[in-house]
Each structure stands twice: as C-alpha cells, then as structure tokens.
Amino acid sequence: MAFIGVAILINGGKNNEGIDNISLFGCLLVLSAGIIFAAVLRWTQRVVAKVSTQAYTSVSIVLGTITTLPFTLLLTENWQISLNSTGIAGLLYLAIGCSWLAYWLWNKGLNSVDANISGVLVALEPLFGILFAVSLLGETLSFSAALGITIIMLATLGSTLLPKLLKKSV
C-alpha cells in the first residue's frame, strides 16, 4: 500500500504535471536502492549485534568513502569551494550531519527497532522530503501528492498499529 502511495506521490508532480517531468532512470535507481536496502537490512542488524556500533559506523563511513570516491572524481564538475560562512557551514553539514550523525543515528535505530518496523519507516522518506520541500522551499502540494502522502501515512500507521491491536485482541 505504501508503494502505491509513493507512486501516486511521484506521479503528482508540481501542478499535476506528473510523470513527464520525472526521470524514469532516477525512479529505477531509487527502486533499486530500496530493494538493496531491504536485502541487507536483516544482515546489517545481525552484524551490529556482534560488533560495537562505533566499529560498524567507522567501517561504514570508510567503505562508503572508498566506494563513492570514483564517482566523485568522475562526476564533479566544479572543484571550487567558497571559503565563506555559507561554504564552511555546507562542508560541516556534509561532514557531520550527512555522514557521522546520520550513520550514528541509523546504528542506534538498528539496535532499538525491529527490522520490520525500520523497513516500514523507509516508506516515510519521500513523505519527509515533500514536507521539507513545502516547509523550507515554499513548494506547493498537488492533490495527487497529498493523496500519496495520505496513503503512505495510512499504510505506515496500519502496519505498525495493526499487529499491536491484533495482539491485544488475541
């Protein structure tokens, strides 16, 4: 159900322009990332149970850096970094927020949340992307985007609350 909600959300676009403005290749890349994520989620949880969160985070950051370095070298168009307050804040955000803090929070979540729940929460990523675009960038929601958000929320709530309700009734 959440997958249908994401599809409706993507199809909505700005002013209901829809799928014409969306790259099919980009959507396939996101779908591939989701499939890979689902495939390694349980394995990652088992690894984190055997090693410390700090060790796992360190290895993840180093391996992530090594595997993305060739793409960075090939795809970077401009190597100029503005050494002003905005440029330095951007570098700090990328170094701390998107790297270290993101991995640390992810590993803390893996230690405390069941793999099934974390898999469901991944469906909320596009929803938060849209909400941040609306609140921070002043984007507007189309009807189909709002419908997609509603379906994603209902699927997420249903998959997390329904097992608890069924467990109480038994």
From Swiss-Prot:
Query: This protein's superkingdom?
Result: Bacteria
Q: Report whether Lyase shows up as a keyword of the record.
A: no
The yes or no answer to whether the keyword Membrane is present is: yes
What SUPFAM superfamilies does this protein map onto?
Answer: Multidrug resistance efflux transporter EmrE
Q: Name one Pfam family in it.
A: EamA
Q: How does it sit in the membrane?
A: Multi-pass membrane protein
Which residue windows are transmembrane per the record? Answer: 21-41, 55-75, 86-106, 117-137, 143-163
Q: Where in the cell is it found?
A: Cell membrane
* UniProt xrefs under InterPro entries: AA-Vitamin_Transporters, EamA_dom
Q: Where is the EamA domain?
A: 35-161
Cellular component terms per the entry's GO annotation: plasma membrane
The record's keywords, sorted A to Z, are: Cell membrane, Membrane, Transmembrane, Transmembrane helix, Transport
The record's comment on protein family reads: Belongs to the EamA transporter family.
Q: What is this protein called?
A: Uncharacterized transporter HI_0976.1
Q: Which organism is it from?
A: Haemophilus influenzae (strain ATCC 51907 / DSM 11121 / KW20 / Rd)
